[in-house]
C-alpha cells in the first residue's frame, strides 16, 4: 500500500499523455481533411 500514490501518479500521467495524443491526432486529422476539402472545392471551380 505504500507505493499506491506512485502508481496513481503514473496512471494519471499515462492518461494525460494518451488523451493529449488522441486530441492532437484528432485535431490534425480534422485539419488535414478540412484542407483537402477546401483545396478540392477550390480547384473544382
From Swiss-Prot:
Membership in a protein family: Belongs to the asfivirus C62L family.
Name this protein carries in UniProt: Uncharacterized protein C62L
Organism: African swine fever virus (isolate Pig/Kenya/KEN-50/1950)
Lineage of producing organism: Viruses, Varidnaviria, Bamfordvirae, Nucleocytoviricota, Pokkesviricetes
Amino acid at each position: 500500500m505504500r507505493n499506491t500514490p506512485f502508481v496513481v501518479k503514473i496512471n494519471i500521467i499515462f492518461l494525460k499523455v494518451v488523451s493529449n495524443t488522441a486530441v492532437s491526432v484528432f485535431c490534425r486529422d480534422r485539419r488535414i481533411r478540412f484542407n483537402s476539402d477546401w483545396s478540392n472545392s477550390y480547384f473544382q471551380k
